[in-house]
A protein has these predicted regions:
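Extreme N-terminal starter segment of soluble prokaryotic enzymes
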Residues: 2-6
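A short helix->loop->beta-strand "cap" motif at the edges of active sites that frequently abuts
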Residues: 27-29, 219-223, 284
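Short internal beta-strands
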Residues: 32-36, 222-229, 265-270
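Electropositive, gly/pro-rich neighborhoods at or near active sites that engage anionic ligands
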Residues: 36-171
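Short, flexible loop segments at boundaries between secondary-structure elements
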Residues: 38-39, 219-236, 291-294
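Active-site glycine-rich loop that binds ribose-phosphate moieties when present
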Residues: 166-186
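Charged helix-capping and loop-helix junction motifs
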Residues: 206-213
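C-terminal functional extensions of proteins
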Residues: 236-309
Length: 309
C-alpha cells in the first residue's frame, strides 16, 4: 500500500503556524490534522473548539496572525452588547467567529458527530486538508490550582495562566475512543508529525486516549516531534510552567520524554544543539534546525526540513 498522506498532531498557535508552512511544501489534500479537543468548552450555551478553529482558520488563511486566534479583521459588537446583560465576557467571542460556534452547536444538536461537523465546516471555508478531532467523546483538560480546579480556558484565558499549578488531568480520557478516521490516519501515514504544541495541554489530552497512543506506538511511519521549547523556555504560552508541574524537565529533553514510547526523532532549535546528547541515549534521533516561525517562509523552511528527515 502506498502511503501518501502526512499526519500532524496539533493544537495551539505553534501548530497553526507549522501547518501554514507544511501546505506550501506538500499538497494540502495530503495533510491530515488530528486536533486536540481538551480545550473545548461551553460559553453562552455554545460549543467552543478553540484549537480546531485556530487550525481551520489558519488553513483557510483567515486566522488573525497578530493575536494568534480568531478571525482577521474581527469586530466584537455582540460581545459588547452581551456585557450589558451581564454575560461573561472574559472569553472574547468575535462577531464572525460567533457564527462558527453557532453553526457547530447546531450541527451537534442535529446529531452530527464532532468529526462530521468539522468535516462539513472546514470544507465550507475552503480547507482541503482533512481536519479530525482526536475523539468525538468529551475529553476536558482540568488544571488543579490552590483555588480549585479550573477548565483549561478558565486557567489560560480568564486567569491568564497565573495560578500555581498543582496537577493536570484529562477528564473523560479513560472512556474516550478515537474515531476510525483518526486511527487509520496515524497507522497509514507516510510520516507522523507532532507539531510544536504544548506537550501537556495540546498534545497530552490526545495521548491520554489509549487507542491514540497505541496507534502511535504501532504505526510503521516515522514519528517526528518539533520541540515547542528553546532552552528552558516555551516559545509561547504556559508549556514550561505546566511541564514543571507535571514533573517533566523543562527542556527539549523533557519534551522527548513526554513522547518517549513512540518517538523516532525530535527536532531541536540550533541554539539547543548541545542538548542533543542528553536525548540520543534514549534511542530517539535528534535533528537540528531553526524552529522559530516568525512568518510563513520560516514555517515553510521548517516543514521542508521535517519531511526530509
Amino acid at each position: 500500500m502506498t502511503r501518501t498522506h502526512y499526519t500532524v498532531l496539533a493544537g495551539g498557535t505553534g501548530a497553526a503556524k507549522f501547518l501554514r508552512g507544511l501546505v506550501q511544501v506538500v499538497p494540502e489534500e495530503d495533510v491530515h490534522v488530528v486536533v486536540n479537543v481538551g480545550d473545548d468548552t461551553e460559553i453562552w450555551g455554545l460549543h467552543i473548539s478553540p484549537d480546531i478553529d485556530s487550525i481551520a482558520y489558519a488553513l483557510a488563511k483567515r486566522l488573525d496572525t497578530v493575536r494568534g486566534w480568531g478571525l482577521e479583521n474581527e469586530t466584537f459588537r455582540c460581545l459588547e452588547e452581551a456585557q450589558t446583560y451581564g454575560l461573561p465576557s472574559w472569553f472574547r467571542l468575535g462577531d464572525r467567529d460567533l457564527a462558527t460556534h453557532l453553526a457547530r452547536t447546531e450541527f451537534l444538536r442535529r446529531g452530527l458527530t464532532l468529526t462530521g461537523t468539522v468535516a462539513h465546516m472546514t470544507k465550507a471555508i475552503g480547507v482541503k486538508a482533512r481536519v479530525l478531532p482526536a475523539t468525538d467523546d468529551p475529553v476536558r483538560t482540568k488544571i488543579e490550582t490552590p483555588g480549585g480546579v479550573l477548565d483549561f480556558q478558565e486557567f489560560f484565558v480568564r486567569e491568564r495562566w497565573q495560578p500555581q499549578v498543582r496537577s493536570v488531568t484529562y477528564a473523560g480520557a479513560n472512556e474516550a475512543r478515537a474515531s476510525a478516521a483518526v486511527l487509520n490516519s496515524i497507522r497509514e501515514s507516510k510520516l507522523v508529525i507532532i507539531a510544536p504544541s504544548n506537550p501537556i495541554t495540546s498534545i497530552g489530552p490526545m495521548l491520554a486516549i489509549q487507542d491514540v497512543r497505541d496507534a502511535l506506538r504501532c504505526t510503521r511511519a516515522e514519528v517526528v516531534a518539533i520541540s515547542p521549547l528553546i532552552g528552558h523556555a516555551a516559545i509561547s504560552g504556559p508549556a514550561a510552567k505546566l511541564m514543571e508541574a507535571c514533573g517533566y524537565e523543562v527542556s527539549p529533553a523533557g519534551v522527548a520524554r513526554c513522547y518517549h514510547d513512540f518517538l523516532d526523532n525530535i527536532v531541536l532549535d540550533t541554539r539547543d544543539a548541545a542538548l542533543a546528547g542528553s536525548i540520543r541515549y534514549e534511542t530517539i534521533g535528534v535533528q537540528i534546525t531553526d524552529i522559530l516561525m516568525p512568518d510563513d517562509e520560516a514555517a515553510r523552511r521548517l516543514a521542508e526540513f521535517v519531511i526530509g528527515i
